[in-house]
Amino acid sequence: MSTFLLTWIIMTVALSVTLFLMPQQTNAARAFFVFGDSLVDSGNNNYLVTTARADSPPYGIDYPTGRPTGRFSNGLNLPDIISEQIGSEPTLPILSPELTGEKLLIGANFASAGIGILNDTGVQFLNILRIGRQFELFQEYQERVSEIIGSDKTQQLVNGALVLMTLGGNDFVNNYFFPISTRRRQSSLGEFSQLLISEYKKILTSLYELGARRVMVTGTGPLGCVPAELASSGSVNGECAPEAQQAAAIFNPLLVQMLQGLNREIGSDVFIGANAFNTNADFINNPQRFGFVTSKVACCGQGAYNGQGVCTPLSTLCSDRNAYAFWDPFHPTEKATRLIVQQIMTGSVEYMNPMNLSTIMALDSRI
């Protein structure tokens, strides 16, 4: 055998072994499913007859395409950045006609701006995907995937997936605190919060029954500190609206208790609590520390704190989005969202309970 041929055989075998041992990122990457409201909607409302939409400029001004996508952000949103951090492609909206074939195996985004825990939250936005409908679409998704890879592998894909659930803020902002609110006349803030937690537990139990086994559940941020609440409460010096802050202070601890109780009932840490209040409060309370000029005024909007109405092509628009913690009256900029994801990935129990996402990924990789 010639030296050349022997060398060629050795190199070929070595390359084959190397390729065999290399992690197969595309096949091994876990699916990612997203449920919730405008904080995580990646464009489903574009396909609906609704007033809750972000499909016109200047939304998306800093997105890679420079165009609005339906994300309530100047650029990437929370699911995008989580996907980026875990080495996965961004999930497509479940209503997108592009979500077909192998793209289904990456996961899907079911979120819809305007929805809440309660079905009467967001009625002013007309046609939105309420959480029950999101779950129906999740069932239909699983049927579609089963046609591609079979039912057993579909169950494995869903069981092994990472799931993000973001609900609750709209139930306060666009229901309880909404002008002429029936809910507010019927119950105290504490009673309403208890109702939300009771209904949320039913929602998360249904999600578990649909196959979810790793679910990150975000609480509400500092509701009284968003520009919309500063404007509507008549804040003079940027003080957060006290009643909305009280709502978050009541709701979030109840949510943690409920998640811990659910995990005990199941016998496993299925539900991971992400403390959205703390992750947001860090840069809201000390914006300069994180490179922001302001955490009170929205980049895009009008009126006091740019917090009145919604962001439109006619709104006042800041020139440097990285100097602002809030993009519009309700939603953070991409830069602020990256700070939130940083704590989701590596934060202490002050931010993630009982563990952060990096720890989850490391533990699950050993299974």
From Swiss-Prot:
Which locations, inside or outside the cell, does it occupy? Secreted
This protein's GO CC annotations: extracellular region
Q: What is its EC number?
A: 3.1.1.-
- Organism equals Arabidopsis thaliana
Superkingdom is Eukaryota
- Its name, as the record gives it, is GDSL esterase/lipase At4g28780
Can you tell me which family this protein belongs to? Answer: Belongs to the 'GDSL' lipolytic enzyme family.
Q: Which residues are glycosylated?
A: 119, 356
Q: Does the keyword Metal-binding apply?
A: no
